[in-house]
Amino acid sequence: MVPRNFSESQLRPEPERAPSNSTKISYRSHSSSFEADDERSSSADHDSMGPDIGSAHRDVPAQYAGEDTRLTSRKELSGWYAYGFAAEVFVICGIGSFIPITLEQLARENGVLLSDPTQPCGSSSTHLPPGLHPGSAKDSQCVIYLGGLQINTASFAMYSFSLSVLFQAILVVSISCAADHGNYRKRLLLFFAFAGSITTMLFLTVVPKVYLLGALWAIISNTCFGASFVLLNSFLPLLVRHHPKAQYGTPDFSPEFRPSSVDESPPEHSLNEPEVAVYDERSALLAHNRISSQASDVAEPFPLSKDSTSIELQLSTQISSTGIGIGYSAGLFLQCVSIVIIWLLNGTTFSLRLVLFFIGLWWFLFTIPAALWLRPRPGPPLPHTGGENSKGSRSWLAYTIYAWSSLFRTVKLARRLKDITFFLAAWFLLSDAIATVSGTAVLYAKTQLRMAPEALGLINVIATTAGVLGAFSWAAISRTLNLKPHQTILACICIFEMIPLYGLLGFLPIVKRWNVVGLQQPWEMYPLGFVYGFVLGGLSSYCRSLFGELIPPGSEAAFYALYAITDKGSSVFGPAIVGAIVDRTGEIRPAFWFLAVLVGLPAPLIYFVNVERGKKEGAKLAEIIEGFKIKDAESAGEGSRGSSIDHESGQNEGLIYPRVGENAGRGRNDI
C-alpha cells in the first residue's frame, strides 16, 4: 500500500507510446455499471493502490461501443489473482482431496462387503486388516447397489466426478458466447463463484442416509468451479494485451527506457540525469517511489526488438505462474487447517463435511475482492440479436444458440490450425491424466493402503507445497536450460510418467516379496505426491499461457471455452474408465496400466507444437472467421452497416482482427 501525498494537479501526463506497429488502437471505456466505482473515473487513479500506469486514459477511436482497453492496472491484476486465491482451494482441498474421500466414506457407510452382502462395510480403516497385501483385498471390497447396479464405493466417487465434468463441459460451451459478447464476463464469473461456494458449504448438511445428496453437491460445485475458471482464463489474454509491458514494449523485461515527453521531438538527455524507474518482472505495476521529481511516472521504451519468444508469452507465463502460485499457497494454508480439524475430530465423517464447509466459506469470502477489483472488460454486442435490446429468456436463448453454433464453426476452422490441433489433442489427454491420477491416487491410498483422512490431507499438503515450488521454479528451470515453452511441458510430462510406472512396479513378483516399493506402503505416497505437485505447477501455467499465445485475437472466451471443453470434457472419460476397471477387478492398482498410457500419449503431440507457426496460422484464421461474419451480416440485411464498421474501425461484430492490407509484414502482438 502506497500513501497518496499528491494532488489532482500532479497527475502525470498520458504516456507516449513507443513506435510500434504491432498493437491495436483502443480507447477507454466509459461503460459498465458492474465495475467498481473506483475503476470508472479519473479520480479513482488516486486510490490507496498508488500511482498506476494502468489508469492511463487513451483517447483513440473505439472499435465497438463500450470497449474497455485501458491499460491493465495493479488493482485489476490483484482482482485476477484474488479469485485464484479464493477458488483454487476448492480444486486443491476439495476435488483434489476431501470431496472424493467424503463421497467414498458416505457411500461406504451405506454399503456392504462384496464377499458377504449381509455384512456392512463400516469405515475404510477397519475393512482391511493391517499387513494384508492389497492384492488379496478383493473379497474385502465395499459395494453399493444403485438402480440395480453394483458399484464399488471408490467407483462411486469417480463416477460422480465424471458426471460433474460432463455437465461442466455443456455449461462452459453455453456461456462462452455471453462471456465474449456484452458485459456478462464478470457477472457470470461472480454468479458461478458464489453458487459453487454456497453448494460446497452445503456438504455440512449431508448425512450418510442421504449420501446421494453429497454427489449432487459435488456435481454442482465442480460444475460451477469449472465454469468460473473458464471465465477467469478468458481475462488472461486481455490483461496481457493491455499490460504496460506489452503496450509499451519491454522485450525480456529489461529494456532501455527514455522518459516520455509531451513534445513530439525526442528529449535531450544529459549523461548525469537520474534514470527513470522502470518496470521489470520483479517489480509491482506501481512505482513505490520517484527517483526524480522531474521525471514522469511513466517510462517509455525504445521500439521493440525481435525476440524468439514474444513479450506477451513471457508476460502471460509470468502472470499465469504467479496466479497458480498464489492459489496453491492458499490451498496449502487451508489444507493444513483442514488436517488440524480432522485430527481434532478423530477423522469422522462429520469432520470431513465440516472441512468442506470451510472450503466453501473461503471460496465465498475471497471472491469479494475479485468482485471489487476486477474490471468487466466487456465485449462487443452479440450480432443479429439487437444487442442490448434483447432481454430476458430470449436474450439468453440467443446467446446459447449462438455459442453452440460458434463452437461447431470454431472447431471446423480450428482443424485448419495445425498447432492448435496438436495442442488441443495433447491437452485432451494430459488434462484427463492430471484429473484421473489425482482422484485415483487419493482413493487408492484410502481403500488399498488404509490411510486415515488426516494422512491423506498431508499428502495433499506435500503436493500443494511442491505445486507452489513448481509454479515459481519451472520458469527458472526453463531459462537455465534454454527450453521453449513446449519443451518445458515435455519435461513435465516425462516426470509425470514416473507416477503410474512406479505404481506398476507392484505387479512384479520380486517387488511384491519386498513388501515395499510399487505403492505397497503408505509412506510411498508422500514422495509421489511431491512429484505430482511439482509437475502440475509447471503444466498449469505453461499450458494455459502457451494456448493463450495461439488464440486468434478478439475471441478469447470462445477459444478458452474450447480449451476448457478439451480439458474438462476429457475428464469425463478417465475417471469413468478407472471406475469401470475397479468394478471389474475389485482393485485400483490395475488402473495404473491405463494411467501410464494416458500420461505418455500427449508427449509426441506437444513435441510438434510450434508457437510462431501457430501465431501466423491464427492470423489467417482470423481473416476466415471475419469473412463468415461479413457473410452472416449480409444475410441478415445488415451488410451495409457491417461493411462500414469493418472498413472504418477494423471491427467485425465482436471479432477484432488485423486487416490484411494494414498488417502486411506485421507480427501479431496480442494474444
Curated annotation (Swiss-Prot):
Its main location: membrane. Glycans are attached at residues 5, 21, 346. This is Autophagy-related protein 22-2. Vacuolar effluxer which mediate the efflux of amino acids resulting from autophagic degradation. The release of autophagic amino acids allows the maintenance of protein synthesis and viability during nitrogen starvation. Residues 1-10, 19-34 have a biased composition (Polar residues). Keywords: Amino-acid transport, Autophagy, Glycoprotein, Membrane, Transmembrane, Transmembrane helix, Transport, Vacuole. Residues 39-60 have a biased composition (Basic and acidic residues). It is a multi-pass membrane protein. Belongs to the ATG22 family. It comes from Sclerotinia sclerotiorum (strain ATCC 18683 / 1980 / Ss-1). GO terms for biological process: amino acid transmembrane export from vacuole; autophagy. GO terms for cellular component: vacuolar membrane. The gene is atg22-2. The chain crosses the membrane at residues 83-103, 155-175, 188-208, 212-232, 324-344, 354-374, 422-442, 457-477, 491-511, 523-543, 560-582, 591-611. Residues 1-67, 251-271, 634-671 are annotated as: Disordered. It is found in: Vacuole membrane. It holds the Pfam family ATG22. InterPro entries: Atg22 (IPR044738), Atg22-like (IPR024671), ATG22/LtaA_families (IPR050495), MFS_trans_sf (IPR036259).
